[in-house]
Amino acid sequence: MSSFGFGLITAAVLAIATVGFTMQFAVTNVLNLAYGSVMINSAYVTYWVNQHGISVWLALFAGVFCGAVVSWCLNRVIYTPFQRRNLAPITVVIVSLGVDLMGTFGLQAIVGGSYVTYKMSQGHEFHFLGMFLSGVQLIIIGICAGVLILIHWLLKYTRLGKAMRATSANRNLARNSGVKTQFIISMTWIISGALCGLAGTVFAMNSGVFEATSNELYIVLLLAAMFLGGPGEPYGAMFGALAIGLSTEISAAYITADYKEVIAFLVLLGMLAFRPYGLFGSEKTL
Amino acid sequence: MSLTSFGFYMSTILVYGAVDALACLGLSIEFGVAGITNFGFIIFQAAGAYTAAILSMPNAATSNGGFQEFVLGWNLPWPLPWIGATLVGGLIALPFVFLVGKRLRGDFAAVGLLVSAVLLNLLVKNYVPFLNGDAGISLVPAPLQNLFNPQSIGYQLAYGGVAIILTVLVYFLLRRITESPYGRSLRAMRDNDVVADSLGKNLRGQRTSILVLGGMIAGLSGAVLVGFISLWAPGAWGYAETIVLFAAIIIGGAGNHKGAILGAILVPLGFEEITRFLPPFGSPSLVPALEWVAIGLLIILFLWFRPNGIIPEKRRILSTIVHRAPVTPDADDDDAESASNIGSVNDFDFRSVLTTAPVVNDHRVMLSTQGLSKSFSGVTVVSGVSISIQQGRLTGMIGPNGAGKSTVMAMLAGTLSPTSGQIFFEGQDVTHVASYKRAQAGLVRTFQLASEFKKLTVLENLVCAIPHQSGDSFTGSLRGRRYWGSEDTSNIERAEEILEGFGLSQYADAYAGGLSGGQRRLVEIMRALLAEPTVLLLDEPMAGVHRNLARKIGNHLVKLCKAGMTVVMVEHELSIMDEFCDPVIVLAEGKVLAEGTMAELRANSEVVEAYLVG
């Protein structure tokens, strides 16, 4: 049962990250493989602020802000100019890998290779239903629930969210129908970037210690969760994150921790091979 | 530096350079020529290195005090381990065919390969009994080490020489493939795979062959490397090493094998050597970190400022007619050009470029559908369409936007598979026959949207559509120009003839991507004709073509039908329908509304209401 608790917290972090990742893909059509490096950079910004004696829960906002600004800049300076050139979609994917290298190793060049940790208390440990969860972990799950409800509200009930969905479904049609698609795309990068920054910070909190390359494999979990729920489907991403988070931790408990990511890999490859549009998606979404 | 140590240094450079060049060549044929973004390329090099290691090493339990665990250990003499490595590199490509097969988008397949590389590295690292886990395999014997002294300068230089010779051989092999009709098909697939498929190219087959070939080359490169450095471990083949190779061929020039070699010298080798001579500074992780930053930056800068690399892919001049000054088409000058430059489709007989035997028109049913339906996520676009297309007739298809015309055409050609219903071609049920096979059987389509192969010249676009080319297969391409050369020349002449007929000869050697919209439509029609169709499906072929020229083409289509070809044409211009098409099928809201001559349709109030006046 304790592995279920670990799975829940892993899933919570992953859900925040995957929803942002999948929104980027849906609305802006960029498979941004640099997402993980923006996460870890944001986690470091939180760390720097935290080092100056500010509570990590306030510093977290700096991380969120960093994620939003960096993502917006990436789109403005790199992805959009490349997309405007009307190149094969794979070019932008290769570019995002280049960005990922620069982001991850640029950070490593600045901060060095040593592990750091936030100054924070883990809070009381709670014990219920056979699970042990620290106060911090409970807060992370709470943040995750709050974020998912907010995203649901954004997509379902706000003009911005509807415009985002319209842009995702058909960008040209949306533009011709009066949606300011460039603005919507910028907003998507800011919102998904904020989620990315938040995910990076809670990822670092949950890991305890981290360094510049700590989430090197995280992109695989992200991709697995995204493809499980269907690429570009925010609700699918929530489900995918839950499934991947739980299954990696439970398999770690019952098989061996060395292979805990393996299940995510296999899920991802299986989805790509047989249902690349996700469990609930349909052919047309590709 | 003494002469001997310089010699050792040189041999290291030679071997590393050759290994990197081999790897880049393998990636160049996959990515640069065939358009397969193999983000897991390093898997294949690793497989080769491990295979060479465990084939050449003695049994793990009995050798070296048994301090490492691995499978096999067959103690084979050189060159068997290298041959084994090459074969395994190719074999290991086969499981990945499901990712690069026809259905999956290129970027998703790339992600799948990237993830596979990470996964395999993780598995090999953690499962020690297979290949000694994270520590890797060491003390791999050097080739022929019982005959020569591997530490001697002569041996080292000879090793470098062999490596270079192998690289040169691979270079010529790849050039042979790339410059053949098969290479042309590969490049067509790279530029637009859906269209290549519609012209009868077997995408899965082509991609499998090239993935296997690239894997073999990568496997060989791994074998050469491990024989020299005598150890191999998961740390040497992280997924990011593939990105280094991508950086190399992007910088050198993807699609040009010379560029791949240049890239190998500049990036993997250059970076290694430069850092060797850097004075130590900062923390030990600083220099490698900065290297990665530089590689990321170089990828982005090159893709932006010089996307074709230092040595770009060269334009293939095929035309046999005396070279006029190459004309650069002006894509913005649509109207002027269609009125003057082109449009001289005069007395040219299209039939003459086709090699199929003349057919007597019997107006039998060539192509028919039974209750054909298609829905996308619950929205029904085509429902219950049953039509029959008669031989030797020019059948028109009209209908308001969204009536399902293009969807019907796509289902007829096999680009889309129907949700329900059946399609019969010459009496055979072809509902589940792959689109490329339908094209090979003579059911050829064109596309509503521009579908030229951008980085093939106009002439290459045309020639690559010609069916049954003996050089258009993997084995055919290996047999060389002597085997397919004369046939290719006559194919080129046929293509030039039809190009002349359309008045586009001056653009023969220009990239098709640079043509104007109207010219591209014409290239597409010519290309479809050269594919030797018995039934030709034209999706708005006249869009953007000058009215006078459109009428001339219409006349020629009628002539082709009289000579036995069957044509189905979707068109919005009713005057064209009036003049050339009989019968005409009207689609509305996914259903067949009416069928008959245009005169009959104009008398049908339902049709007039749905379409003609709307």
Regions of interest found by a model, annotated:
Chain A
Residues 81, 88-157, 184, 250, ...:
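Transmembrane helix-bundle core of multi-pass membrane transporters
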Residues 132-210, 234-240:
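Helix-loop-helix "hairpin" substructures at the membrane interface of multi-pass membrane proteins
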Residues 54-99, 239-244, 275-276:
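Alpha-helical transmembrane segments within multi-pass membrane transporters and channels
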Residues 110, 169-176, 180-183, 255-286:
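Cytosolic-side transmembrane-helix boundaries in multi-pass membrane proteins
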Residues 5, 27-73, 77:
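Membrane-embedded helix boundary and interhelical linker motif in transport proteins
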